[in-house]
Amino acid sequence: MIVTPTSVKGLIEIKSTITKNAIEQLLIQSNSDVSKELPIDTKFNLLGTKSTISPKTVCKHIMEIYKDGDIVRGLGVIYSLDWKDIIIFDTRNDEYIAHVLNNFDYGVSSFVNNLLFQIYGSEVYLSIANQIGPSLFIPKERYKIR
């Protein structure tokens, strides 16, 4: 089956270990020439089973890399199964923000919930949330990337 670039809603990269190098690779992919053919709202997501860096370090590293560079396609969610927090990226009022939220041991379900929101929109997300119960996230840190 052939998938046209315009039908891609998001990409998920799965790594055994989230490292600074894995973050750099994700950013290179999201800013590649191929990414320019994807819809503007396409998000790049990263899921790892473990990590060598903290969510705070991930955000600071992304800020360093994007300090002088262009952002072609945004990031969606970065999560490692050994973290207590989840990183969710948001664009509002011409700002590109990384939110570090307390995940409350929801584990990978928080990652999947955010993907559902990205891909299917708020109606599907809220429909599922109403059936399984609300998710509670407490913001811990906020990083303005741009």
Feature map (PLM): residue ranges:
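Intrinsically disordered, low-complexity Ser/Thr/Pro/Gly-rich regulatory segments
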Residues: 1-146
